[in-house]
From Swiss-Prot:
Record-level GO cellular component terms: cytoplasm; ribonucleoprotein complex; ribosome
Protein's gene: rpl28
Subcellular location: Cytoplasm
Function statement: Component of the large ribosomal subunit. The ribosome is a large ribonucleoprotein complex responsible for the synthesis of proteins in the cell.
Keywords attached to this entry: Cytoplasm, Ribonucleoprotein, Ribosomal protein
Name the UniProt record assigns to this protein: Large ribosomal subunit protein eL28
Length: 33
């Protein structure tokens, strides 16, 4: 159960990081424009 939870947390953090990066990229794009 602990290992499964760890994997889920890793997946969640990974997706969150990518989504945050995407948002930051969009914001930077807007600032440049």
């Amino acid at each position: 159960a602990t290992s499964y939870e760890k994997i889920t947390i890793n997946k969640n953090s990974r997706s969150t990081l990518s989504s945050v990066r995407h948002i930051i990229r969009k914001n930077n794009y807007r600032k440049d424009l």
